[in-house]
Amino acid sequence: MHPIRSVLIVTKPGHPTALDLAQDIGVWLTRRGVSCRILEGPGEALPLRQLAADAGLVLVLGGDGTMLGVARRLAGTGVPLLGINLGRVGFLAEVPAGEWAATLERLLAAPLRVERRLALRFGVERGGVEIFQGDAVNDVVINRGALARVITLDIDVDGERLAGLRADGLIISTPTGATGYAVSARGPLMDPALDAFTVTPICPFLGNFPPLVLGGGSVCSVRIREQGTEVHATIDGQEGIALRSGDRITLTGLRDGLCFATLGGGGYCARLRACGFVRDHACTLPDMLPDEGGTSTDV
């Protein structure tokens, strides 16, 4: 991509530290000839998309939650994002707050490199009419309400029936979201570059529905076959939709829907270790070669 000439900074709303840091970064960028605009909180999708259209980079100051909100509103625009981590995990907002200057110096010194990933696009249909459409960065979760009862869902893939599922819920996750709720439900970790998404049940009745990986172009349809129990769809853990019996959610991959500025350096495995998703138990194996007497070492 071309060198960065303009930056939109989006801060976590109501976070004085983020706003102060945004002012510091804005001054730093202006001194280097880069135009800058600061927005407190992502707000509504349309104004954010309009502001981001003129930016070569959207810099997000907050944690992974703030990154999710911004990335979801900008899904499909192709505008690259970079997160400065003021939160905890920092799997999406990967730049430590104390390293912002060195990171931006590197980004301004060469053409920007980006990593494009799959997002989810979904619609909710009620009585044959689409009542909601949206995008998801991490996942769409269909689950029960306050009562501790299983729900029943009918699942189709590409127009073919897959199964009727009785479970606490269902997680449809992107590769980016595989390290979120899905991995807690024993879904697979996925390389973010994969053109695929997962369908993972939450506590399936009798355990008869393993996690399923679908190609990014697949269409997964989930119909609510439940009477008298509250059912909700939650998008990225941030937005919710109340569902009724007979409602149908249709989901598919949005190729290149997410765009992140990449810094190089550590790869996916290094990030998994750094964020605690895998543990590296170093060990020394015994010498299995025969000794000079022709006998092998006992193990």
Swiss-Prot record:
Name its co-factor(s): a divalent metal cation
**Which EC numbers does the record give?**
2.7.1.23
The record's subcellular locations are: Cytoplasm
Q: Name one GO cellular component term.
A: cytoplasm
Active-site residues, Swiss-Prot/TrEMBL? D64
Q: Give the binding site residues for NAD(+).
A: D64, G65, N138, D139, R149, R166, D168, T179, G180, Y181, A182, V183, S184, Q238
Q: State the Gene Ontology BP annotations.
A: NAD metabolic process; NADP biosynthetic process
For this UniProt entry, the molecular function terms from Gene Ontology, in alphabetical order, are:
ATP binding; metal ion binding; NAD binding; NAD+ kinase activity
Per its UniProt record, what InterPro entries does this chain match?
Answer: ATP-NAD_kinase_N (IPR017438), ATP-NAD_kinase_PpnK-typ_C (IPR017437), NAD/diacylglycerol_kinase_sf (IPR016064), NADK (IPR002504)
Catalytic activity from the UniProt record: NAD(+) + ATP = ADP + NADP(+) + H(+)
Q: Which domain of life is it from?
A: Bacteria
Q: Which SUPFAM superfamilies match?
A: NAD kinase/diacylglycerol kinase-like
- Identify the keywords attached in UniProt to this record, alphabetized: ATP-binding, Cytoplasm, Kinase, NAD, NADP, Nucleotide-binding, Transferase
Belongs to which family?
Belongs to the NAD kinase family.
Q: What does this protein do?
A: Involved in the regulation of the intracellular balance of NAD and NADP, and is a key enzyme in the biosynthesis of NADP. Catalyzes specifically the phosphorylation on 2'-hydroxyl of the adenosine moiety of NAD to yield NADP.
Query: Under what name is this protein listed?
Result: NAD kinase
Q: Source gene?
A: nadK
